[in-house]
Amino acid sequence: MIQAAKYIGAGLATIGVSGAGVGIGLIFSNLISGTSRNPSVRPHLFSMAILGFALTEATGLFCLMLAFLIIYAA
């Protein structure tokens, strides 16, 4: 019974990973849109997009780490 609850909790914790995937897609789609509108600001937009990517990916990895902790922690 406890093992089943761990698997359910880990599955729910991985929902954040899908949110991170959507967030990364939005970041880079807006980067492409902004670069096509004004190519001269590409370096600034790219650095901001990489920062947003890193923060979004960190959130997704945190959710994945939490899922592994739920499953394998004693």
From Swiss-Prot:
- The domain of life for this entry's organism is Eukaryota
Any one GO biological process: proton motive force-driven mitochondrial ATP synthesis
What residues correspond to the site Reversibly protonated during proton transport? Answer: E57
Q: How does it sit in the membrane?
A: Multi-pass membrane protein
Q: Which UniProt keywords apply?
A: CF(0), Hydrogen ion transport, Ion transport, Lipid-binding, Membrane, Mitochondrion, Transmembrane, Transmembrane helix, Transport
PROSITE patterns found in the cross-reference section:
ATPASE_C (PS00605)
Family annotation (CDD domains)? ATP-synt_Fo_c_ATP5G3
Q: In the record, what terms sit under GO molecular function?
A: lipid binding; proton transmembrane transporter activity
> Where is it located?
Mitochondrion membrane
Q: What transmembrane ranges does the database entry give?
A: 8-28, 50-70
Primary location group: mitochondrion
Q: Does the keyword Protein biosynthesis apply?
A: no
A Pfam entry, by short name:
ATP-synt_C
- One GO cellular component, as annotated: matrix side of mitochondrial inner membrane
InterPro entries in the cross-refs: ATP_synth_F0_csu, ATP_synth_F0_csu_DDCD_BS, ATP_synth_F0_csu_sf, ATPase_proteolipid_c-like_dom, F/V-ATP_Csub_sf
User: How is this protein organized at the quaternary level?
Assistant: F-type ATPases have 2 components, CF(1) - the catalytic core - and CF(0) - the membrane proton channel. CF(1) has five subunits: alpha(3), beta(3), gamma(1), delta(1), epsilon(1). CF(0) has three main subunits: a, b and c.
Q: Can you tell me which family this protein belongs to? A: Belongs to the ATPase C chain family.
Its function, per the record, reads: Mitochondrial membrane ATP synthase (F(1)F(0) ATP synthase or Complex V) produces ATP from ADP in the presence of a proton gradient across the membrane which is generated by electron transport complexes of the respiratory chain. F-type ATPases consist of two structural domains, F(1) - containing the extramembraneous catalytic core and F(0) - containing the membrane proton channel, linked together by a central stalk and a peripheral stalk. During catalysis, ATP synthesis in the catalytic domain of F(1) is coupled via a rotary mechanism of the central stalk subunits to proton translocation.
PANTHER family in the record: ATP SYNTHASE LIPID-BINDING PROTEIN, MITOCHONDRIAL, ATPASE PROTEIN 9
Q: What is this protein called?
A: ATP synthase subunit 9, mitochondrial
